[in-house]
Amino acid sequence: MEQKKKVVVAFSGGLETSFTVMYLAKEKGYEVYAACANTGGFSEEQLKQNEENAYKLGAVKYVTLDVTQEYYEKSLKYMIFGNVLRNGTYPISVSSERIFQALAIARYAKEIGAEAIAHGSTGAGNDQIRFDMTFLVMTPGVEIITLTRDMSLSRQEEIDYLNKNGFEADFTKLKYSYNVGLWGTSICGGEILDSAQGLPETAYLKQVTKEGSELLRLEFKNGELHAVNGEVFEDKIAAIQKVEEIGAAYGIGRDMHVGDTIIGIKGRVGFEAAAPMLIIGAHRFLEKYTLSKWQQYWKDQVANWYGMFLHESQYLEPVMRDIEAMLQESQRNVNGTAILELRPLSFSTVGVESQDDLVKTKFGEYGEMQKGWTAEDAKGFIKVTSTPLRVYYANHKDEEV
């Protein structure tokens, strides 16, 4: 008897990957291994349901690959160091997790000696590139299967196939589709498809439950979140989740992102990301007090590239390790507590407490009495600084300004 070919399906439990498991097992005769790579977006209940469904769909084995810590250590902390917001708006939420999901799937495929890897991406988005590119690089020679893309399947066709073969689940096309992750939730569909419309309150998974305002104190050590309102967290994932819990109650972190996809078309996505926006907001605020002008400037330049490369499936590019080294080194004096004021749908910065505060120094306070120089020193400095302009206008006296 001919041995069945092994295929690892990157299994999220959604429609496309559910169809993929059943179709490959039933129609193609593969020995299907369903692997759910969790980067912090799945609850225990969801993972349990995924396991039950995978076996019902025909998988011979189901595994959960927990890569949440790896995701934080190898990318997320650098996104915080760099205050990474794509187009100044979007914290690269779920998209930043895809590479680590793909890497986990690739490692598992090599571990079991799989001949193929399958995923449920369509042909219209960025995820197909993130998954395919990672598999091509990390598992050369292993076949990549993408049924939804290659067979040009509609959601209804996949639903009909599953129902026909005895698997019934609620895959009814909802008005919105959600991708929930540790670093935020993206929202697609509905009003998102109309450039002139925003999302209604009901579109958000987390509703506003708090009124009034409160202060949030986020303490950082070497740029990493260390404590939330005085509570120390050795587990950085738990710290992020705590900030999310606090901020989501105010509906903080909601916005609309418009950007260019890897394949060249513009895309629009809604998102809710309380923890990312609060943590980045606090971290950036603290850096204004603790970093030099040029540290901030150059860090912003490389961080922008880091975010762009991460979004565009270039995490494996060697220059990313160089950027990470620079970002890591830049954080040695980013220590202290940033204080934020939260209110429904917004927050503002209040102040910082830091031993590395460069604002409070013996040299003087902005707009007040100088302590590190004399009045004559100041006048001399101003005269020297003005030299290039004085030379220029002395030679161009007729030039109007």
How would you name each of these model-derived features?
Residues E2-A10, L15-V401:
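Nucleotide-activated chemistry modules centered on ATP-dependent adenylation/adenylyltransferase
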